[in-house]
């Protein structure tokens, strides 16, 4: 393996291998059409696989992001799983557009927050009637990733998925059934309120200084 400008490749006889699943003695890796080692979720030949977000190693016989993988690394396919995987794939694509490979996690957090804070506001549906159901966080996040706009729930869900791709593990979409925000490490990140009210206040805010109280939150 070689790393160039933050991207990992595999060379054989001095040439990059491309568009294949590479098997080493211990692990499998997916190399894309440019020879880059794939990280995160990926669809390959009609199946979904997960490759460690840092190393690119294929995961097998375990649960990742709440999704079961078989001994070949294939994700269990059902409507909820496929929806969440596609949302995570789109979140990763967006992070790659917004952030540099060399950015620190803190820099990525700020850049992702700033990006979401600029998303045009549009409400496609109400959260209150459906928040007891599974999968609404993917549905709302897709408003931003697929349509480029959304409400506070859409913005918060999209930001939460993006931060998850940046390597943050304790990320939640929290809400009071009408307004939503991101909870990260017990702190509030509210992109819509930041834009509409006070930009710096609603970035890394303590709950003691926040006017909303969560009735529900979903871990990404």
Where are the predicted features?
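Hydrophobic/aromatic-rich core segments of domains that either
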Residues: 154-215
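Short polar catalytic/cofactor-binding loops
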Residues: 7, 120, 194
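Secondary-structure boundary elements
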Residues: 86-143
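Substrate-binding/catalytic groove segments of enzymes
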Residues: 57, 122-127, 188-190
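Extracellular adhesion/carbohydrate-binding repeat motifs centered on closely spaced tryptophans
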Residues: 1-89, 175-176, 181-184, 199, ...
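Active-site neighborhood of thiol-dependent amide/isopeptide-bond enzymes
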Residues: 117, 124-180
């Amino acid at each position: 393996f070689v790393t160039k400008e933050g991207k990992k490749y595999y060379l054989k006889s001095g040439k990059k291998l491309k568009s294949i699943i590479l098997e080493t003695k211990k692990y499998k890796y997916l190399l894309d059409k440019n020879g880059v080692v794939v990280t995160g979720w990926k669809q390959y030949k009609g199946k979904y696989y997960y490759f460690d977000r840092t190393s690119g190693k294929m995961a097998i016989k375990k649960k990742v992001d709440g999704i079961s993988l078989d001994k070949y690394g294939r994700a269990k396919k059902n409507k909820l799983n496929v929806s969440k995987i596609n949302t995570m794939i789109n979140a990763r694509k967006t992070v790659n557009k917004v952030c540099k490979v060399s950015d620190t996690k803190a820099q990525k957090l700020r850049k992702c927050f700033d990006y979401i804070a600029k998303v045009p506001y549009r409400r496609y549906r109400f959260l209150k009637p459906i928040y007891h159901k599974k999968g609404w966080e993917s549905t709302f996040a897709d408003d931003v990733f697929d349509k480029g706009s959304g409400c506070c729930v859409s913005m918060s869900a999209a930001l939460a998925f993006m931060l998850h791709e940046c390597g943050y593990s304790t990320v939640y979409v929290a809400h009071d059934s009408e307004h939503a925000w991101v909870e990260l490490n017990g702190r509030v990140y509210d992109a819509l309120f930041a834009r509409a009210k006070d930009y710096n206040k609603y970035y890394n805010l303590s709950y003691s200084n926040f006017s909303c109280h969560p009735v529900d939150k979903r871990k990404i």
